[in-house]
Amino acid sequence: MFRKTLNSISRRHFSSSSPESPSLYSFLKPSLFSHKPITLSPSLSPPQNPKTLTPDQKSSFESTLHDSLNAHYTDEAWKAFRSLTAASSLPEKRLINSLITHLSGVEGSGESISHRLKRAFASAAYVIEKDPILLEFETVRTLLESMKLAKAAGPALALVKCMFKNRYFVPFDLWGHLVIDICRENGSLAPFLKVFKESCRISVDEKLEFMKPDLVASNAALEACCRQMESLADAENVIESMAVLGVKPDELSFGFLAYLYARKGLREKISELENLMDGFGFASRRILYSNMISGYVKSGDLDSVSDVILHSLKEGGEESSFSVETYCELVKGFIESKSVKSLAKVILEAQKLESSYVGVDSSVGFGIINACVNLGFSDKAHSILEEMIAQGGGSVGIGVYVPILKAYCKEYRTAEATQLVTEISSSGLQLDVEISNALIEASMTNQDFISAFTLFRDMRENRVVDLKGSYLTIMTGLLENQRPELMAAFLDEVVEDPRVEVNSHDWNSIIHAFCKSGRLEDARRTFRRMVFLRYEPNNQTYLSLINGYVSGEKYFNVLLLWNEIKGKISSVEAEKRSRLDHALVDAFLYALVKGGFFDAAMQVVEKSQEMKIFVDKWRYKQAFMETHKKLRLPKLRKRNYKKMESLVAFKNWAGLNT
């Protein structure tokens, strides 16, 4: 048994005496339910000379109570109940439980809930004192659940003490955990400790197994003694109670004791705990070590904190996988003691002991630096990093860098992040792809394009296989920010990298962006580069160029483009790649008519007729009238006979001669 293994703890008997309970109606004190002054309700205590009710009168009040509850008339129901209690009478069991359950409802405003809970408490306390057999266990549970929602710790504890005083023994599992939750939410488990002790005494003295607190309750009591009250005597009492009741401890039980022993500097006791854990078959020491760290931090014994961390690493397994809360507590202690050098030393020593299989985010270095970042001590994280480099000659694990990089990413400090990535690469370490992608995305969001390019180059140099995500992020960001010149330069840099999938759509995006911004020569050069690298232009490529040329009134360039595409769509194989459609026919016709290239325009018309593409002639009539309204055939005949023929053919086709 657990009791027998702790030789230092002498047998203690449960005390049958308990602190004096508050008055049954102390709930009427405003402090129990609210910090605001409240008008006191009259007590439910019957008058000294109660008036006896006749059977008819009692029946009438019960009927009123029943009807009021059904109609949800709370005040009327309460008045009927008060009338009965004023005559030292109680309604039947069903009505009592219905009333208390109704009053325990949490609907409505905060003030009305508080008022109803006072009445529910008063009713329950009165019934417990007068005739507890009328009160159902489930009604008590419902009332306590409402008190939990209302965070009414005082009334909840008063109700339990009232139950004990009047020997109304409700099974512990119906109310124990609720009271624990209420006390915990109220900020302290110390009040629960008294309830725990009394429940243990009743279970033993009255031989009531159902009143026995379970392991969860025992651990809550231990937490109160060790973590909050820091009382060795009370903790030993709880352990003795667990032994008497046959409650087997778990890792959490040992953890609370480890905290207290570390807090008090009782190293021998901690050694005893470790031996006891072996005896109980607990292989994991993670909870034990975490609590020891907390205790040593609280006592200011930072050397012992370092020893525990390094010892946990020597043990291997999950023993060193401490929680974020533990690392935060640890970091606070060291920083408050101005022991940044000690933190750096701990990380360096830990790196020597950590297995190569330990994940980046499971390392001690990651835990400490991540805690610094989470606590807002980013400057301290830098200081630790610099101190590690100074102490270890650059032997800094990747886990130390990751939290700082994530913080930079979150704060969009992308230039600093990029500089740090360069340092990481030069030290021979390699970042995870997800972190690199996140940094590139942050750089693009921050419009720090230089950092994004630098990070991408670093990924390429480190032979990262998956570059697709970052490539798309950069291209999309540049497009959204209308930086086609950077898109072109970036594409030119990566186009021959087999890990990057470049396609015609990427070239089209650059061409479109150049045309949209009026940089037609850059668009033309990009188009030539695209063709040179054997990327096949498609209809979207040509549409972007045509629209750009029309906007800049560069109609001759459209003619050159038509002559180029005309040859392609003549062959069957090329036609499959660059097939004329309605949009492309419309764009070419409009531009060629506006430019006065009627011969080419009629070639487009012929192609559209061959491919059975519908053409709306009205649009080109308008284009002709806007641009060539004053064009005279006699003058044109003298200068260029062929052009005149093309003009006549176009006018006949468009219906301009009628």
From Swiss-Prot:
<feature type="repeat" description="PPR 5">
    <location>
        <begin position="361"/>
        <end position="395"/>
    </location>
</feature>
<comment type="similarity">
    <text>Belongs to the PPR family. P subfamily.</text>
</comment>
<feature type="repeat" description="PPR 8">
    <location>
        <begin position="467"/>
        <end position="497"/>
    </location>
</feature>
<dbReference type="Pfam" id="PF13812">
    <property type="entry name" value="PPR_3"/>
</dbReference>
<dbReference type="InterPro" id="IPR002885">
    <property type="entry name" value="Pentatricopeptide_rpt"/>
</dbReference>
<feature type="repeat" description="PPR 7">
    <location>
        <begin position="432"/>
        <end position="466"/>
    </location>
</feature>
<feature type="repeat" description="PPR 4">
    <location>
        <begin position="323"/>
        <end position="353"/>
    </location>
</feature>
<dbReference type="Pfam" id="PF01535">
    <property type="entry name" value="PPR"/>
</dbReference>
<dbReference type="InterPro" id="IPR011990">
    <property type="entry name" value="TPR-like_helical_dom_sf"/>
</dbReference>
<feature type="repeat" description="PPR 2">
    <location>
        <begin position="250"/>
        <end position="284"/>
    </location>
</feature>
<feature type="compositionally biased region" description="Polar residues">
    <location>
        <begin position="50"/>
        <end position="61"/>
    </location>
</feature>
<feature type="repeat" description="PPR 10">
    <location>
        <begin position="538"/>
        <end position="568"/>
    </location>
</feature>
<dbReference type="Pfam" id="PF25245">
    <property type="entry name" value="TPR_At1g68980"/>
</dbReference>
<feature type="repeat" description="PPR 11">
    <location>
        <begin position="581"/>
        <end position="615"/>
    </location>
</feature>
<feature type="repeat" description="PPR 9">
    <location>
        <begin position="503"/>
        <end position="537"/>
    </location>
</feature>
<dbReference type="Pfam" id="PF13041">
    <property type="entry name" value="PPR_2"/>
</dbReference>
<feature type="repeat" description="PPR 6">
    <location>
        <begin position="397"/>
        <end position="431"/>
    </location>
</feature>
<feature type="region of interest" description="Disordered">
    <location>
        <begin position="39"/>
        <end position="61"/>
    </location>
</feature>
<feature type="repeat" description="PPR 1">
    <location>
        <begin position="214"/>
        <end position="249"/>
    </location>
</feature>
<protein>
    <recommendedName>
        <fullName>Pentatricopeptide repeat-containing protein At1g69290</fullName>
    </recommendedName>
</protein>
<feature type="region of interest" description="Disordered">
    <location>
        <begin position="1"/>
        <end position="23"/>
    </location>
</feature>
<feature type="repeat" description="PPR 3">
    <location>
        <begin position="285"/>
        <end position="320"/>
    </location>
</feature>
<keyword id="KW-0677">Repeat</keyword>
